[in-house]
């Protein structure tokens, strides 16, 4: 069933936006949401400073933490630092799809762990995928949904913590 959910995610991403062009909007996504993480990454390559304070190339120079909204230390974007040969726009397409698919699959497994049947868990995860913000925001305003896999892991971790199965499983909550 998880493989089927990934296929549905791929199909619906293609159906709703991929067949009309790129999995990413031509407004905010290409002008802001791929540009700022690429700037953060380039600044890291240029300075080697993981915690810079000043961004000289943005707005005449500003405190870089003014742009934390664009995912300055997001785990999703930090992985791109390891891939200097990949264009940020291509990376964001892959990362957005991966976040969406993993959130759907993690929700499915969390529901099964909570005692729901496979059918109910599958249909709920499919409805979650088809909810208005998930696919739309994945290719328009990625920062509104790229936290969803971490939220699903946090739900799983809180359940384990409350059942005292594993005290260390609460750590995804802090991301």
Locations of regions flagged by a protein language model:
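Membrane-water interface at transmembrane helix exits
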Residues: 17, 80, 108-112, 159, ...
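Membrane-interface transmembrane helices that cradle and orient dolichyl/undecaprenyl
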Residues: 154-170
